[in-house]
Amino acid sequence: MNFKEKDPALWGAIADEEQRQEETIELIASENIVSHAVRTAQGSVLTNKYAEGYPGKRYYGGTQYIDVVEQLAIDRAKKLFGAEYANVQPHSGSQANQAVYAAFLKPGDTILGMGLDAGGHLTHGAKVNFSGKLYNSYSYALNPETELLDYDMIRDLARKVKPQLIVAGASAYSRTIDWQAFRSIADEVGAYLMVDMAHIAGLVATGLHPSPVGIADVVTTTTHKTLRGPRGGLILSQAENAKKINSAVFPGTQGGPLEHVIAGKAAAFFEDSQPAFKEYAQQIITNAQAMADEFSQLPTVRVVSGGTDNHLMTLDLSQTALNGKQAQELLDSVLITTNKEAIPNETLSPFKTSGIRLGTPAITTRGFNADESREVARLIVKTLLNPEDEAVLTGVRQRVKELTSAHPLSQLD
């Protein structure tokens, strides 16, 4: 008896999700579509093996081949980013950040990170998160006129609050970040500099965004998003920080590593190092910029900061009849997947928001080009401006199916 026959309820849910991914235009900026190699590695027998510790220094026997896999992931990550040290064990970006805080700080120390409505992440000091509960957290905002990072404003705030650690990097910021400016601020106030490049790591790896590696004291990232790997985390740093970061990950914040996921990371890092991946990463940016440009020519909606330098953008809906939650649900109904997102100086709750976030990694993986990305922008605005016109919504839904049928997931290796 096969899986489908043994457990039809679970099989059915997985099959339904597979169909949803096949039929929808996926614009959640933190999502992508992994290769067959990544899925094979992650679904391998490595899931059976417990391996507390690090290569060559485990607490269990039978880890000789696990060590090979993890060392491959470490070496490939170091080469990909030009780093002296890499830890591939964090289960997620959030746990990578948690381990860094544990390595460099003590509870009650002050951290300074980007606010949520400016595009920051929960783990950058949000009061509802461990980072805002265990540490004395402050947030910097964007310049209210330009909607860009204002390094003079950040410097003034850093001088005032005197953080032990400054977090640079974002979850929803569409412009190039000046790592050297952050380094200068951190040096002036005597703070460590941590960069969370989770969203842009694939662009950094291909030289399409400046790299923080070697500038920051420590760099964290997820391994999915623009890296197109399995869901997981990664920490990069200088060799001198290896011991305290390793200890903070294990045994400090985690137990046994997920070696099947680490195998998926190794597979992804290999793919990310190939020339074709740089072409792919460039197309991600090209598609995002085409989409942002199209929005600028359409009524009612506005791209925060006026455009994008990377893979994502936040769409300000405050001049429409919809909030972010309503827009997300409406777009879901026409098979376009997005997520609600706070805009700078947000006035609505995090459960509603005044914007939506859009990203192009997944559609670029499917093979969408710039013209198709522009069309997707037009379909989004058409939907948002006609929320109750079933004829319009039906037409959009049909066009989405045509676009996704032209780029089936089955074509991917």
From Swiss-Prot:
Subcellular location: Cytoplasm
Recorded metabolic or biological pathway in which this protein acts: One-carbon metabolism; tetrahydrofolate interconversion; Amino-acid biosynthesis; glycine biosynthesis; glycine from L-serine: step 1/1
Domain of life: Bacteria
Cofactor: pyridoxal 5'-phosphate
Class in the EC hierarchy, top level: transferase
Span of the signal peptide: none
InterPro entries recorded: PyrdxlP-dep_Trfase, PyrdxlP-dep_Trfase_major, PyrdxlP-dep_Trfase_small, Ser_HO-MeTrfase, Ser_HO-MeTrfase-like, Ser_HO-MeTrfase_PLP_BS, SHMT-like_dom
Keywords carried by this UniProt record: Amino-acid biosynthesis, Cytoplasm, One-carbon metabolism, Pyridoxal phosphate, Transferase
Swiss-Prot/TrEMBL site (Plays an important role in substrate specificity) positions: H224
Gene Ontology cellular component terms for the protein in this record: cytosol
The enzyme's E.C. designation: 2.1.2.1
Biological processes, Gene Ontology terms: glycine biosynthetic process from serine; tetrahydrofolate interconversion
Positions annotated to bind (6S)-5,6,7,8-tetrahydrofolate: L116, G120, H121, L122, S349, P350, F351
Sites bearing N6-(pyridoxal phosphate)lysine, chain numbering: K225
Entry keyword Amino-acid biosynthesis: yes
Any one GO MF annotation of this record: pyridoxal phosphate binding
Family stated for the protein in its record: Belongs to the SHMT family.
Subunit structure of this chain's protein: Homodimer.
Role description: Catalyzes the reversible interconversion of serine and glycine with tetrahydrofolate (THF) serving as the one-carbon carrier. This reaction serves as the major source of one-carbon groups required for the biosynthesis of purines, thymidylate, methionine, and other important biomolecules. Also exhibits THF-independent aldolase activity toward beta-hydroxyamino acids, producing glycine and aldehydes, via a retro-aldol mechanism.
Name of the protein in question: Serine hydroxymethyltransferase
Organism: Levilactobacillus brevis (strain ATCC 367 / BCRC 12310 / CIP 105137 / JCM 1170 / LMG 11437 / NCIMB 947 / NCTC 947)
Phylogenetic lineage: Bacteria, Bacillati, Bacillota, Bacilli, Lactobacillales
